[in-house]
Structures are given as structure tokens and as C-alpha cells.
Amino acid sequence: MTIRRAVVSNRKTGFAMHLLTICLSLFLAAVTAAPLAAQEAEAAEATEAAATADTVIYDLLLKNGHVIDIQNGRNGRMDIAITGRTIHEIGENLPASRAKNVVDLTEYYVTPGLIDIHTHLDQKGAWLNLNPDHNTLRYGVTTAVDAGSSGHQGFEKFKKETIDRARVRLLAFLNIVGAGMYGDGVENDPAQMNVDAAVAMVKKYPEDIVGIKTAHYQPADWEAVDRAVKAAELSNSVLMVDFHPKEGRGYEDLILKHMKPGNIHTHFYGRLTPQLDANKKVQDYMWKARERGILFDVGHGSGSFWFRIAVPAIKQGFLPDTISTDIHKNSIMLPRAHLNNVMSKFLNIGLSLEQVIERTTVNPAKAIRRTDLGRLDKGGVADIAVLKVEQGKFAFLDSGHGKLIGDKNIRCVMTLRRGRVIWDAEGLSMPDWSTAGPYSNFR
Amino acid sequence: MSARLAVLLIGVVVTVPALGQTYDILLKGGHVIDPANEIDAVMDVAISGDKIARVAASIPGDQAKRTINAAGYIVTPGLIDLHAHVFGYGGSLWPDDTQLTTGATTVVDCGGSGWRTFDTFKETVIDRTRTRVFSFINIVGKGMVGSAAENDVDDMSPEKTAAKMAEYPDLIVGIKTAHFAHKGYTALERAVEAGRLSDNPVIIDMRITTEYDRTTQRIFEIMRPGDLRTHSYSDHQVEILNRSTRKVQPFTREARQRGILFDVGHGNGSFVFPVAADAMKDDFPPDTISTDLHNGSIFTTKSDMPNVISKFLHFGMTLPDAIEKSTVRPAKVIRKFPELGTLGEGRVADIAVFKLRKGVFGFTDAPQRRLMATKKLEAVLTIRAGRLVFDQDGLAFPEWQTAGDYEVIPIP
């Protein structure tokens, strides 16, 4: 087997090529015995042309990847040039000679940095939270939204200790429970749910907080949901609901009466949600709720994604609006639900790659009202994911540990955050060591 | 997060054991590599409770409650990562989602805590992880918390360090000294003194640049047999190689002969392809393979255990050799052999299952260069103390269509 060398060129080789061109043209000019003045003029012209072509503008050129950028209608082979933190140019055949570093992505898909709107990354907070960077950026996620790990009492600590230090763009749904996601004691206590305090916190940090979260509330009344709805309304932000139906507190009422258009119900393929009837038919109220603008989010986690629910629902056309992980200390082990895993499940169930990318870029961006994200724009921030769709035999576990065997697997090979290659699984952007010389004292 | 309900439901559906089912889990048909017992063959591994019950050529499936078909996979003792960062140091990682998912069931935190902070380390990490966590305690009382603390020779007390080690002899397996940025050898001498007082090995990370007025030879002289040099394939730590001839230095070989051990400690800055390639070419493999995995290296070099092993496979090490240097050898270093690092019958059932993929794969080193290799080891399943903790290919579970109206299918 031959080993393919890294396809990386740099401006030195480009410059050398141009020098060669200049020499050749000088030589040709000499042998044709052109007048001296003409020779000089030609040489000057050639030098000028070389200088223009060699003006290095791009820090990085992502070459020949299959770009899927739903928002801008891009779906095909294209180059993306990056300068500093931003996308300088997107188009066909951008000149490699203008780039400091060229990466050949012929085998890969290139998408906007993925967005995971249901995560638990307040790592200095409650036990189940994870490190914000390595369970996001390694899977192409450049924007993660923490879903209510902290409430108004703990948010500023979360911001100072984690959000402001993370390399991933970390946003938050603020828990309506002041203490945050710290167990039944506080999460079932309406006295913890101070609407005014939550609203004030959302308004104080509009760059970080995208909305309100309510979750895990067990008493059979509407206190938690209604207060969260009110807080979201008063702060003009998004609401995400995790809901356990009870006698006298039904799911249909939640999505048709209590929640407002634009609110998100997460965990909707979970067992606690009566989304299917006894014959596995999608309930009418699901369609009605979707029509009135309720959004349905996956939020896979340890308990909320079941093939026996998702497969029939998807066959009937009830797809998720947004694909997210609910990633935390348990779900990352078994069933190993990081975003590439969850995306791969939907791909193998039958969604197209475009549908999967739409639900991990544009749709979540709209859901959290950050329409500047999830897209690739000239002049926009260079948050980019490079994905490989592997072919073979792959297995995926759901929350009940039922297994789906599929033939496709999405694997993130490269992630750019603010123009910087922060994850490069196989060194695509790096020069080959064996040609790099004896690089002693590399620092 | 409906995890709580899921947890409650585990155990509701219990596979009723038929008569004669003596084992809880049977790993069937995998290629077992167990250097401690000189096994390198297709074998079945049976587990009862948290122990290895039997390793044999053919154990009938009906003797087990749960059979995992491991045909085509490689089965090894759970790997032991001698150099990890899971406490104290700013780039520390949670070991379960970084190590158990990559085949390491035991990690040794390399100097994150000192005698002042070990109790906190124990309460917040060691007692709460599913990964087995040991400590190389830092000779610095405050631990690896930045240069001000790490250069404070007044906080390097061999006596207090040894006293803490005597308090937790089952958890603290040695002493670390690292990042000492003053002239001379004080940190090393204190660490070795603590090692002498506690009768435990010392692991050393110490630069040799002239600014610190240190030489590799003198460092080797202070070290005792059984002590370890980590970051061996860096080019600013140990002078394994002569830089002009690119051959192994005679004094390095002498040190090995004396019993000084050479650990990988890959990390962010301490593994350079040309150094490793030349050292391997001149027959100087590491004694122990370890990662120095932290929040930086997990991005730059991706150097978890299977990644580091794959790099050595490319430079000519055999897989059984690499497994030995990741199981029985580190177990001996921390004096936990034969409890750990073996699939011996009656030993704890810490087991890793790997796939050895063939193809073309890119790997990266500290200076961010790329190596193209044709083999890649990848962790697919991990068992820790008899319990399945990671199963990427769902080997232990049925297909969802055949599971009926399944409740949570119990984790074996």
C-alpha cells in the first residue's frame, strides 16, 4: 500500500514556480533575440504579475471540500479562504498561491460549525456537567448551549469560571430554578422559581443567555412551566421545556396551550412523551403544535432517545426541528451520545445528510435567535466543521441500549473556531514529519 | 435528563439465568493478548462478578448470562496509563470520558496533588470516578498549580510527603517532580528522599537546558533503579539521542542497565516523531507507554493510549510488546502486579477490547507534524471491575427491532 503524503503546499513552492516562469521567459526572450528594451519590459511585467499572484491574503485555504451551507443554498465542491478570524472568500477555484496553507478536503464535507442546543457544560457546577471544550469541538460543535445547569443564583459563577474561559462558544438557557439543576430538593420547589430574578439575569447577559429552561419538575401542577413561559416572555427570550406528564397535567395541554410559538420541547423522542398512539401513529396534537410554532428538539441523553419511537415517527414524516445531545457525564459513556453519534443515528434512520446538517446548523441558530450562526458568509466568523461520512458497518445504542446497525458514520475530522484549526484529527493541515527535517528544539 | 428514571429501571428487566449459567459475561472469540500470562491467541474470557473466572480456548456460550461476540477484535487487560492528569493541574480531564473510552481502566495522576491537597483529590476525583485512579504525589505540597508553587523549594518536604503516602499506601504509588525552573537538582533530591522514606518510585519531568545548569548524566546519577524518566521522546527533556549522530547516548543505555525506567508521557510537547523514530531504530523502546493526556494534548496530539500505541506500532514495535508496556510493565512499576495488568484467573476483571484498523491514518506529534501510518488501534469496549462501561459498537446489546417493547436493557 502506498502512503499518501499530506497534500499541503505553501507559498514558497508557489514563489519558486513563479521564479522559474520568470527565468524561462527571460531565456526564451534571449534566444528569440528580441531587442533589449523589450526584454526588460517583459521581465518587469512578469515580475509584477508574479508579485500580484503571490500576494498572500489567506491564512488557510480549505480546498475542494463538499460544502453544505443550507442558509446560503450552497451544496457542492467549493473552496473556502480564511484570513484571521473570518471567512475571506467562498467560491470555486480560489488561487492556492494566495494561501499560507492549503488543505485538500476532496474526501470530506465542509459545513458551518455545528450547534448543539442541549448540553450540560457548567463543569464547576453540578456533578453531571462535562468539560465544555473536548466534548464539543472534537465533534465539530463550535456553539453549545448549556440547558439550565445554572439558575440566576449560579449563572455569574458559571460565566466567570467556564463560559469566559471556554474555547467553544458557550451560551446558556437559564434555569427558572434559582439554584439551577441541583436535584429534586430545589427543582421541585416553586419558591425557587423567581421570575423577576431570572428575567433580570437574562437581560443583564444578553450575549450569553439565549433563554429560559424548565426541567424535572415533578409536582402535578403547571407552576414551573407557567413561570418559565412568563420569564421567557418578559425577557423576550427562548424557552426550552423538559416535561414529565402527570395526571391532570397532560402533554397535549403543554404544547397546545401553555407553551408559546418558538418555545422548544426537548426530549420529544423520549418514553415520557406521549408522541405516538398505541399503533405507533404520531398523535394529531404533535402536528398541531408544530403548526403553531412549537419546536421539537432531540436532547438524546441517557433516557430520551428510543429507536422504537424515533423510527416510526420519522417514517411518518415527524422529524426533529433540532438535533442535540443533552451531553453529560452519564450519556457520554453509554450510549455515547456525542453530536456525531446522534447525527449518525438520524442519517442511518433515513434522513439525508443535508437534513441532518440543517438540523445542526441553521435550525438551531434560528431556534436560539442567533441567525448569525450556523452559516458560512464572506466576512463572517470562520467557525467551520469538516466531516467525513464513513461507509462500513457501524452500531449505535439508544437510551434503552437497543442497537441500530447502520452503514454510515459521521466523524468530525477538523474543526475551526474563529479561523483557528482547533481540532485536526489526522493532521490534514500539517506538513509531513519525514520531510520537515530534523526539527530539534521546535519551540 | 431522564437519567434517574433510566437508572431505576435498570434491573427491572433481568435476564433469568438458566441452570448452569455460571458466568456473568463471556467475551467470545476475541484475540487475547495477555503478556503477563504469555497468551497471544484466540481465546474466550469468562467473568463472574468483578473477577476473571476463566480464560480458555472454548467456553460454551450457554454457561454465561451474557455473551459478547468479540471475534475479529483484540482483547487485553485494561490498560494502565502511568502519566495522566485528572486533578490539580489546570488542564486536568475527567478520566471516565477520556480514559475508559480509550481502553485505560487505571490511570495514575502524575503530580496533580501534593500532600496538602491529596485529601481533596481523593474526595472529589478518586472516590467518584469509575476509572481506577492512583496518584504519583507531587513533591510540592500544593501540587501542580503553577510555577510559583512548583518552584517553591520550601514547600518540598520529603517527610510530609512520605507521611501522606503512609496514610494512603493503596492509592499513592510514587512521587512526581516536575517543571522545576531553578538551577540545580533540589526538587529531584527532595523527591528521591521522599521515595527513599516511603520506599516508592519517583517519576521525573525535568528540563536540562543550560539555563538551569543541569545535565542528563547528573540526573541519572541521582535517580535510583526503579525511578522513571517521563517525556522520554521529547527533545528538551532527556538526551536519549546524540543530536549529531542520532544514536542513543552511551550514558542513557547505562542508566537503563542500572534500572532507570523510561516512560513515554506523550502530552502536548513531549513526543517528537524524529526522536522516537531514531530511538526505535537504535533499539531504545520505552519501558512504559503513557499519555500525559490533558486538555491541551487531547486537541493537539490526540495522544490517548491507543493513539500512542499506534505510533509505536508504526515505528516497529509489535502489538504484544506495546500491550506489555501498557499493562504488566506499568503494573510492576506501581507494584500492583499481579492484581492489575493481567487477565489471570481470579484477578479483577478490568478488560479492554480493541479494533486494529488497516487503512491510511494520520497521526500528529508535539510540533504539529503529520505521520501517515497504515495501522490504527481503536478502543471499542471497556469492562471495569466486571461492569461494562463503554461499548462503541454495541457488542453487548441486541438490535432494537428484536428487543420488542424494550425497557432499558440492563448493562452487564
Residues covered by each model-derived region:
Chain B
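Divalent-metal coordination cores built from histidine and acidic residues
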Residues: 70, 96-179
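C-terminal cap of metal-dependent C-N hydrolases
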Residues: 30, 348-402
